[in-house]
Amino acid sequence: MVNLTSMSGFLLMGFSDERKLQILHALVFLVTYLLALTGNLLIITIITVDRRLHSPMYYFLKHLSLLDLCFISVTVPQSIANSLMGNGYISLVQCILQVFFFIALASSEVAILTVMSYDRYAAICQPLHYETIMDPRACRHAVIAVWIAGGLSGLMHAAINFSIPLCGKRVIHQFFCDVPQMLKLACSYEFINEIALAAFTTSAAFICLISIVLSYIRIFSTVLRIPSAEGRTKVFSTCLPHLFVATFFLSAAGFEFLRLPSDSSSTVDLVFSVFYTVIPPTLNPVIYSLRNDSMKAALRKMLSKEELPQRKMCLKAMFKL
C-alpha cells in the first residue's frame, strides 16, 4: 500500500481497483498500442520507401504518424505497466516528463493538422502557385516550426504546473499525469498562472480549428464547382479524412480541458481522455490509408513478390552501414 502522505510522486487511480479489470485494461491497451504502433510505422515506412509519395501532403502525413507514434507512447505503456503491477505510483520525474511530452506532442499535432489543411487548400484552391507555396524548403520549415512550437508549449506547461504548491493528497483520478486533474491538487488561488497558460493554449488551438474550418470552407466551395463527379469524389476522399481527424481530436481535447474540475473522479473524464490520447493515434492510419488509393497502391507494391527482395537488400545494406 502506498503511503500518500510521504510519497514524493503521485498515485494514478486509473480505471478500477479490481484486479480482473486491471488485467483487462492492460490487455485492451496493449492490443490498441500494438495496432497504433504497427499502423503508424507502416505509414512512415511506405511514405519513406515509395518515391511516388514524396510530396508535401505525404511528407506532413509522415510527420503526423510520427507524432501519433510518440503521443500514444507517452501515456499507454506506463498505464499498462501500472495495471499489470497493480500499482499506480508514478515518480515526480516521470510525471514531469509525461506532462512535458504529452503537451508538446499534443500541441505539435494540432499545429501539423493546421499545416495539412493549408496544404490541401493551396493544392486545390491555388494549384498554379502550389509548387511555389509548398516547396521542399517551406515544408521543412513548417515541420521544424511545428516541433519547436510544441516543445515550447510543453516546456512552459511543465515548468508552471510543477511550480504550483500542492495542498491535497497526491492522487490523480486518471491513467496518466493529466494537467486538469493535477490542478485539483493545487492550493487555492495558486494555479492562476497555469490557468492563464491553459487559456492561451486553448485560444491557440481554437485559432487553429478556425483556420482548418476556413480552409475547408474554401476547399469545398472550390470542389463543388468541379464539373466532373469523379474529380469531386477524389478530392473529397482526400480531404474528408483529415477534416474528421482534426475535428475529432480538437473537440475531445477541448471538451476535457475546458471542463471545470470537480473534486470527485468522473467516468466522463476517463472516457474523453481515451478519446484524445488513445483513439486518434490508433485510427489515423486506418482513416488515412483506407480512403487513399495512392497509399493502398504503395502498400500493395511494397508487399509484392517483385519488390520484397529489393526491400530486403536495402535493409541488409542499412544494417551493414
From Swiss-Prot:
Per UniProt, the keywords (alphabetical) are: Cell membrane, Disulfide bond, G-protein coupled receptor, Glycoprotein, Membrane, Olfaction, Receptor, Sensory transduction, Transducer, Transmembrane, Transmembrane helix
The residues that cross the membrane are 24-44, 53-73, 98-118, 138-158, 195-215, 236-256, 270-290
Instruction: Report the Pfam families cross-referenced here.
Output: 7tm_4 (PF13853)
The domain of life for this entry's organism is Eukaryota
Instruction: List the stretches on the Cytoplasmic face of the membrane.
Output: 45-52, 119-137, 216-235, 291-321
As for membrane topology, the entry says:
Multi-pass membrane protein
Which GO molecular function entries does the Swiss-Prot or TrEMBL record give? Answer: G protein-coupled receptor activity; odorant binding; olfactory receptor activity
List residues in topological domain: Extracellular: 1-23, 74-97, 159-194, 257-269
> Can you tell me which residues the record assigns to a coiled coil?
none
GO terms under cellular component: plasma membrane
Question: What CDD domains does UniProt report for this protein, alphabetically?
Answer: 7tmA_OR14-like (cd15227)
The UniProt entry lists the main location of this chain as membrane
* Glycosylated residues, chain numbering: N3
Kindly give the InterPro entries that the UniProt entry links to this protein. Answer: GPCR_Rhodpsn (IPR000276), GPCR_Rhodpsn_7TM (IPR017452), Olfact_rcpt (IPR000725), Olfactory_GPCR (IPR050516)
Q: What are the disulfide bonds?
A: C95-C187
Q: Into which family does the record put it?
A: Belongs to the G-protein coupled receptor 1 family.
Physiological role = Odorant receptor.
Mind telling me what this protein is named?
A: Olfactory receptor 14J1
Q: Which organism is it from?
A: Homo sapiens
The lineage is: Eukaryota, Metazoa, Chordata, Craniata, Vertebrata
